[in-house]
């Protein structure tokens, strides 16, 4: 049995979020939460929030125990890019691309034995 949680349109670059999400893939949820709590990156806050949501979904919707859960799948997809303009000298304009991410975490029960 699996439980999942998705956060969409998070205003962080997918490349930066993938650096953090690679740290927790395949780990027990308690270990993953500890890693995220002490990782000094902006993405770790959002990923921890999604992981806690996935754990709550597993406990409340699927009657799984938190002790047996692990991060089965964790991935970051690219969301839409917001375009912003930055005025420059002599009437020119620079384009800022604000990248967004869709973060998905799937937790499952580890088979005992």
From Swiss-Prot:
Family annotation (PROSITE patterns): RIBOSOMAL_L22 (PS00464)
Database matches in Pfam families: Ribosomal_L22
KW Ribonucleoprotein (keyword) present: yes
Gene Ontology cellular component terms for the protein in this record: cytosolic large ribosomal subunit
MF terms (GO), sorted A to Z: rRNA binding; structural constituent of ribosome
Keyword list, A-Z: Ribonucleoprotein, Ribosomal protein, RNA-binding, rRNA-binding
Top-level taxon of the source organism: Bacteria
One of the protein's GO biological processes: translation
InterPro entries membership: Ribosomal_uL22, Ribosomal_uL22_bac/chlpt-type, Ribosomal_uL22_bac/org-type, Ribosomal_uL22_CS, Ribosomal_uL22_sf
PANTHER family: CHLOROPLAST 50S RIBOSOMAL PROTEIN L22-RELATED, LARGE RIBOSOMAL SUBUNIT PROTEIN UL22M
Binding partners and assembly: Part of the 50S ribosomal subunit.
Function: This protein binds specifically to 23S rRNA; its binding is stimulated by other ribosomal proteins, e.g. L4, L17, and L20. It is important during the early stages of 50S assembly. It makes multiple contacts with different domains of the 23S rRNA in the assembled 50S subunit and ribosome.
Family of this protein: Belongs to the universal ribosomal protein uL22 family.
Annotated protein name in UniProt: Large ribosomal subunit protein uL22
Organism, scientific name: Carboxydothermus hydrogenoformans (strain ATCC BAA-161 / DSM 6008 / Z-2901)
Lineage per the UniProt record: Bacteria, Bacillati, Bacillota, Clostridia, Thermoanaerobacterales
């Amino acid at each position: 049995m699996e439980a999942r949680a998705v956060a969409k349109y998070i205003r962080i670059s997918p490349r930066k979020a993938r650096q953090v999400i690679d740290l927790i893939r395949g780990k027990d949820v308690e270990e993953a939460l500890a890693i995220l709590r002490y990782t000094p990156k902006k993405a770790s806050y959002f990923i921890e929030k999604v992981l806690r949501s996935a754990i709550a979904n597993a406990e409340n919707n699927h009657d799984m125990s938190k002790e047996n859960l692990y991060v089965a799948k964790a991935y970051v997809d690219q969301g839409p890019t917001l375009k912003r303009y930055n005025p420059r000298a002599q009437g020119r304009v620079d384009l800022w691309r604000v990248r967004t991410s869709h973060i998905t975490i799937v937790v499952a029960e580890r088979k005992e034995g």
